Amino acid sequence: MLQQILQDMYIDPELLAELSDVQKHILFYKMREEQLRRWREREAWDALAQAEGLRPAKVKRASNKHLQWLLGADGEVWVWVMGEGPGDKPYEEISEELIAERARLQAQKEAEELWRQKEAEITKKFRDALANEKARILAEKWKVEMEDRKAAKILEERIHEEFKRKEEEERRRGEEQIRLQEEQRAKELYWTLKQAQLHSQASENEEREWEEQLRRSKAADEERSRRAQRARDEYRRHSLRAIQKGTVAGLSTMFQELGQNHEQEARLYHQLPDTSPPSPLTGPDRTWERPLRPLSREVIVRWFKEEQLPRRAGFERNTKSIAPWFHGIISRESAEDLLENMTEGAFLVRVSEKIWGYTLSYRLQRGFKHFLVDASGDFYSFLGVDPNRHATLTDLIDFHKEEIITVSGGELLQEPCGQRDSPPDYHLLFE
């Protein structure tokens, strides 16, 4: 499935919605790598073709654009030197005036913004204070008798006038403070702009900035390469750890036991009507032609019976019992309802309606995560998250009971979420 997406450079929006944030980041990173690889390959072919004379080098087209100088009365190019013309001010004076005007306008703009903020703060401050005081007075007014209400009203008006007077004083102090800040800021901006004008004549700063940007860009590329290498080393470590813990050995033992116990396998599939006992070492029926993607529930049910039942998908290891974590074709909302009242680490596996595979729904401390499991090939693996490939679906689940799914999330499968209704939601898959 991932190879098909990278080949077409397109992913279905419905399938994209099923991916988690980590899966989306990894998928977009892979697509960007594929774009760079194609571009480098095309550039190499073009260079090789030009070197061997198979393709002529690109020639710049002649431009129709031209420049025409303004001529004076004497027929020469018209030139005006600022500050040297009749009635012109000296260049230094013009420059000083421009800098002073820019500083004044900038300081005025900043002062207006500061005053708006200050005025809003003052208004809010006294509005809140007045509201609190009114609330206090209102509470007291309910306690007094009818003859005291007039006195309370007079007191309220006096307090209101006092607050208004204090507000006016605060406004005057705020305006004076803003005015002083405006003058100070105008002076600072004047000297800042003056120094910037003097320094702008040297080009060494621009050169150093360009070199610094280039250095940062190279450092960022190296950091991304190191992160990718660390991720590959982490995945390789998980694979080696799984081999050391006997996952592969257990898989071989399972196939040997299945090959030696055909009668037990026949009794298992005798319970499923219209399904013959398959051999554990043989592939799916070649008369079944799988579409590019699931089209309907009927097609998904047939795919499961034709391709997944022979691979014992959904069964416990070395038994004929269906795993407690296995569910049928249920929606994302139904899966989250089942996991709602369970603790962090609870999980279930449901048959996907978007891809040929499954969706592992995981319970977080707050919320849920959903991982797509690709089963379109001869193995089972998480789509875009974990490069490890597993021979059976049960191997994948058992592996991640001991190893986390993603390094960033630290998801570890702990408690399976079983069935709640009768018949179970997977009964159509085994009829």
Swiss-Prot record:
Residues 201-235 are annotated as: Disordered. The keyword Thylakoid does not apply. SMART domains: SH2. CDD domains: SH2_SH2D4B. Residues 325-417 form the SH2 domain. Residues 211-235 have a biased composition (Basic and acidic residues). SUPFAM superfamilies: SH2 domain. It comes from the Eukaryota. Keywords: SH2 domain. It holds the Pfam family SH2. InterPro entries: SH2, SH2_dom_sf, SH2D4B_SH2. This is SH2 domain-containing protein 4B. It comes from Mus musculus.
